[in-house]
């Protein structure tokens, strides 16, 4: 993990782990580039080509945000999310899908997805949802930090 010296406020983290899951390499790479351009050194971006690979990656590393396609070979996004939730119930899952059928959105809600965006997705919509996920993480980290100390940084 890279060490970055930065002026970071209490409860704010330097790096967030983002997992992109899509069987379409061109879409995955384009999305990674756009996210990297927006967040820069605040994110580490990892990639998986299908749901099965995403589950395997989640079993070895915690991810802060998972951006996942619904329709993929080997294991679809909803099924992968069910397995991922058994491993990590706190990560934010954002689905990107070409399916506008309500049933897909309902299934996304069942696995506690943060959002369900339709492809082609406006990058500003995705970044807004990612910002919400990061704010949620920062609040959770601040609570953990204050719980571990007396609120003034003392243990």
Language model features with spans:
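Switch/coupling loops of ABC transporter nucleotide-binding domains
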Residues: 16, 43, 91
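Conserved acidic segment of CheY-like receiver
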Residues: 16-27, 31-32, 66
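Conserved Asp/Asn-Gly motif in the active-site loop of CheY-like receiver
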Residues: 48-52
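C-terminal output/effector regions of signal-responsive regulators
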Residues: 149-155
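Non-catalytic signal-transmission and effector/linker regions of two-component phosphorelay proteins
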Residues: 1-17
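CheY-like receiver
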Residues: 55-147
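Two-component/phosphorelay signaling modules centered on CheY-like receiver
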Residues: 25-46
């Amino acid at each position: 993990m890279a060490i970055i010296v930065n002026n970071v406020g209490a409860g704010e983290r330097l790096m967030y782990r983002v997992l992109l899951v899509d069987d379409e390499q061109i879409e995955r790479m384009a999305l990674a580039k756009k996210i990297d351009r927006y967040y820069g050194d605040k994110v580490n971006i990892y990639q998986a080509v299908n749901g099965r690979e995403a589950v395997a990656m989640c079993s070895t590393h915690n991810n802060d945000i998972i951006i996942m396609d619904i329709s993929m070979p080997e294991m679809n996004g909803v099924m992968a999310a069910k397995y991922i939730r058994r491993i990590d119930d706190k990560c934010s899952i954002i689905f990107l899908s070409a399916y506008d059928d309500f049933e897909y959105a309902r299934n996304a809600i069942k696995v506690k997805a943060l959002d369900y965006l339709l492809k082609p997705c406006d990058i500003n919509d995705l970044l807004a949802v990612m910002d919400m996920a990061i704010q949620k993480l920062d609040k959770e980290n601040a609570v953990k930090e204050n719980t571990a100390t007396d609120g003034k940084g003392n243990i």
